[in-house]
From Swiss-Prot:
SUPFAM superfamilies: JAB1/MPN domain
Similarity comment text for this entry: Belongs to the peptidase M67A family.
Function: Acts as a regulatory subunit of the 26 proteasome which is involved in the ATP-dependent degradation of ubiquitinated proteins.
Annotated Gene Ontology cellular component terms: cytosol; mitochondrion; nuclear periphery; proteasome regulatory particle, lid subcomplex; proteasome storage granule
Motif (JAMM motif): 109-122
GO molecular function: metal ion binding; metal-dependent deubiquitinase activity
UniProt cross-references to PROSITE patterns, sorted A to Z: MPN
Boundaries of every MPN domain copy: 27-162
Hydrolase listed as a keyword: yes
Keyword match Magnesium: no
UniProt entry keywords in alphabetical sequence: Hydrolase, Metal-binding, Metalloprotease, Protease, Proteasome, Zinc
Positions annotated to bind Zn(2+): H109, H111, D122
Gene behind the chain: RPN11
Stated name of the protein: 26S proteasome regulatory subunit RPN11
Phylogenetic lineage: Eukaryota, Fungi, Dikarya, Ascomycota, Saccharomycotina
Length: 306
């Protein structure tokens, strides 16, 4: 009898774990969606902005975000009432006409300059989305702290209060994928792992998107024919000459000082310091290179004008 009870208890626990989310669950964001979120967030600084994410729930481990669109609301906080249902319905109808028939998988909003976490108002907004779909995702992006090559972004979902009451883990762990990212201390202060948990984020790029992004800041052959203003160039040359004179004087002074130093002292002479000889050579080389390019460009442009 006791064995049967243990088997029944294990079955219940297994069924409960099967319905839980997994730490391996990953939100895949496309390049166009990420660029739109960053552009929208940067345009709204210093106010918060919000929008909806379109995509699909591929399986229990994958949420695919294909595109996003902005909502006509901004403010210091985003409330449930700020979600314009009429605008959302019209926007979805227009997107379907263009072949974008994905469903709403969540929402995003910006935190300009103060990190990625959910406030109490954001938690209430996320509750309204999870009432429609319990797998809805809330993405927070910081356009101020984001720099080239490093996007400050995070995805969240609320923790079931029933699991907290029963002292259960909100998610089951089947791999180490969800344990690779270190939690932000600022998010922990604002309720991370108490009221909501963080999801893994990855970026999906098609071959066409990869080629487009590589060519985004690629210089063309016309870039070498652009002329710099002569007055600016003259000012730069004068400043470079002054720097070289100062470094040359410093170098001659160092030579006099080195005559009195031993070989052991000479080995550690410039450790952690600027070597005036190398600095002088580098400055002179850069100045000559820039002036040579400027003279050649001016000659090509003068011939082209004739």
């Amino acid at each position: 009898m006791e064995r049967l009870q243990r088997l029944m208890m294990n079955t219940k626990v297994g069924a409960a774990d099967a319905n839980k989310d997994d730490t391996k669950e990953t939100v895949y964001i496309s390049s166009i969606a990420l660029l739109k979120m960053l552009k929208h967030g940067r345009a709204g600084v210093p106010m918060e902005v919000m929008g909806l994410m379109l995509g699909e729930f591929v399986d229990e481990y994958t949420v695919n975000v294909v595109d996003v669109f902005a909502m006509p609301q901004s403010g210091t906080g985003v409330s449930v009432e700020a979600v314009d249902d009429v605008f959302q319905a019209r926007m979805m109808d227009m997107l379907k006409q263009t072949g974008r028939d994905q469903m709403v998988v969540g929402w995003y909003h910006s935190h300009p300059g103060f990190g990625c976490w959910l406030s109490s108002v954001d938690v209430n907004t996320q509750k309204s989305f999870e009432q429609l779909n319990n797998r809805a995702v809330a993405v927070v992006v910081d356009p101020i702290q984001s720099v080239k090559g490093k996007v400050v972004i995070d995805a969240f979902r609320l923790i079931d209060t029933g699991a907290l009451i029963n002292n259960q883990e909100p998610r089951q762990t089947t791999s180490n994928s969800g344990l690779m990212n270190k939690a932000n201390i600022q998010a922990l202060i604002h309720g991370l792992n108490r009221h909501y948990y963080s999801l893994n984020i990855d970026y999906h790029k098609t071959p066409a998107e990869t080629k487009m992004l590589l060519n985004l800041h690629k210089e063309q052959w016309q870039s070498g024919l652009k002329m710099q203003d002569y007055q600016e160039k003259e000012t730069e040359n004068l400043e470079a000459t002054k720097r070289m004179v100062a470094v040359a004087q410093q170098y001659s002074k160092r030579i006099e000082e080195e005559k009195e130093l031993s070989e052991e002292e000479l080995k550690t002479r410039y450790v952690g310091k600027q070597d005036p000889k190398k600095h002088l050579a580098k400055t002179a080389e850069n100045t000559l290179e820039e002036n040579t390019v400027s003279v050649l460009t001016a000659g090509v442009n003068s011939i082209a004008i004739k």
